Amino acid sequence: MNFTKTDFVISMGMTIAVIFMSFTFPALGMTGDSVQENEIPEFNITKGSADFAREQPEYPARPSEGTLTYKNNSANWADGRQTYLQKGDTEYLVSFFDNSDNQNPPEWKLNLIKFNSSGSYSESTIITEGESKTLTSADGSYEIGFNNLEIEDSAVGNETASVDWKVLEQPSDSTWIGRLPVVGGLISGANQLASVVGWIGAIIWHFVVQILVTIGNTLLIFYNIFVYFLEFMYWITTAYSGVVAGAPTAWASVIVAIPGILLGFEFVKLVALAISLLPLT
């Protein structure tokens, strides 16, 4: 048994005829009830799909220098006006922004902030072109130097500038064993290595989860298409049955039913062919 080109043409033609009659005949008042828009199954290919909103784990190294850039009206701080020096239970952050509240000339402000469960502690200073400034965190752990302020635009609403920063002092291992010569370096190196290994594991898991979510969403797309096909077939069968039943005469019902009968034969043939291809038959 084969599903030939002729079978395909008949199936497509009769499907179009059934859909056409189901929509147009009632609308023209020839037979059946008019199709209501809210009765048509809604197709949502992404129904039930999962969102992958996890951020990629950051490398655990402590940055030692860089450039902060401020651009007024930039979205979500995407211009790079802040940088985390350290993340974890206690976090340190440097930030750079215009403190003049849209006044001209701008007043460029630097912040060094410490966050932990007890609260936040901020040290700040104003910097102008040609100046070098230093900020020390509230607990004395970090000392940051700032220089090379470059102002690209001072116009109100378009303030844009950048400044270079560099870590002059940063936290070290505070335990007595961590301060021992050689041993302290080994422990610090081991801790850093463990952090990097953990980061590699987190990166691998991040991509594994992303792949699993992608595969799951792809399978869900095919499932949604299949379910919609069944829902649409049920709806169109119901609508078409109403068209056939509402024909004004018996002969009209027979004529209107011909496309559905032919389509039914082709569908049965297709199902029989699919069953014959199963490995157990």
Curated annotation (Swiss-Prot):
Keyword Signal: no
Keywords on record: Virion
Region (Hydrophobic): 8-28, 196-216, 219-239, 255-275
TM annotation in the entry: none
Protein's cellular compartments: Virion
GO cellular component: virion component
Misc remark: The virion does not contain any lipid membrane.
Annotated protein name in UniProt: Structural protein 26
